[in-house]
Structures are given as C-alpha cells and as structure tokens.
Amino acid sequence: ARVLAGLETPTSGLIRYNGVDLRHLNLDSVNRFRGFILDSQLSLFEGTLEENILLGRTYIPYSDVRWALRFTELEEEVDALPQGLKTHVRTPGKIFAPSHIIRILVARAILSRPQLLIFEGILHNMHPAMRETILRRLCSKEEPWSVIFVSNDPNLTPHVDRRILLN
C-alpha cells in the first residue's frame, strides 16, 4: 500500500498513474487525485476536527466537508458536539472512538473526490452495519474513484470487482 500510495519506492518494477511512471510525477499533483489510509497512520493530529479533515486543503469548499461528513455518517454526530467541526482534537482516542477516527480519516481521503483511493486494512474497527454502509458507498459505481483495498479481509469480496492475491 505504501508503494502504491507513492510513499515508498518499489524495489523492482514500476508504479504508473494513468500510464505515467510515478517517479516522474510531482507528489503534490499526485496528492490532488488520490487519497489513502494506511493501517500505520490511523491517528488524528492535534488541531480542530475540521483541520484534521481538510489536511491543509483550504481551497476545498465547506459544502464538500459537509458532503464528506454525510458520506461517512458523521454529520449528525459532529453537529451534536458543542463546537462541531471546531472541536479541538487532543491526544487521539480521548474524544473519538477508533470507529470515529476511521470515519474521519475516510472523510479526509474522499474529501477532494479523488480518482484513486487506497485503503490498507482500515475498516475492521467499525461496527459491522456501519462498515457495510461505508463499504457500499465507497465501492459504488456512482462515485468518481477507483478503490484499492490492501487487506486479507474476506468480507471485502462482495464489494469489489476484482481480487488479486499476493503471496
């Protein structure tokens, strides 16, 4: 997943985005058309909830933030917080449960409606019904993205068109 996301260089072979070798692309421009969540990075940073979702992308309209919250079933829960999106995130886990953190990270990943989403085994900490809802939405043909799941979770199978097994 880290190689696919462009965070590590492959030891052999190439990673191509739309036919172009990833090594020849500017990582900032790649970040505009892909989103990812890796198991090793399942935490929020100190700042507001809004800052955690925007991740410095201040050009993204507020309406898109609201859309991402609705997509991840967080809108009502965030609105119920006394400070809403301005709620300050301190040490991860103090305010938000792991399932909330995962949905916040999914909201961050989908916020710019990227062409490619890469998820590394992230949805296992969610309540099964919520997980199914999020998976169904992520894998919907109506969305503008392709999704790659790097996982050994057999429950993903009904949601994907193609599976590649690596040994």
Where are these regions (language model features)?
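A short, proline-enriched helix->beta-strand linker immediately N-terminal to the Walker B motif
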Residues: L111-Q115
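ABC ATPase nucleotide-binding domain helical subdomain, centered on the C-loop/LSGGQ "ABC signature"
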Residues: R16, E50-T91, L135-R136
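ABC-fold ATPase nucleotide-binding domain signature/coupling loops
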Residues: E75-I104, R108, I122, N167
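ABC ATPase nucleotide-binding domain signature
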Residues: F33-S43, G47, R57, P92-G93, ...
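Conserved ABC transporter NBD signature motif
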Residues: G13-V20, V30
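Conserved catalytic loops of ABC-family nucleotide-binding domains
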Residues: A129, R136-S151, T157-P158
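Catalytic Walker B motif of ABC-type/P-loop ATPase nucleotide-binding domains
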Residues: L117-G121
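Helix-to-loop junction immediately C-terminal to a conserved catalytic motif
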Residues: A5
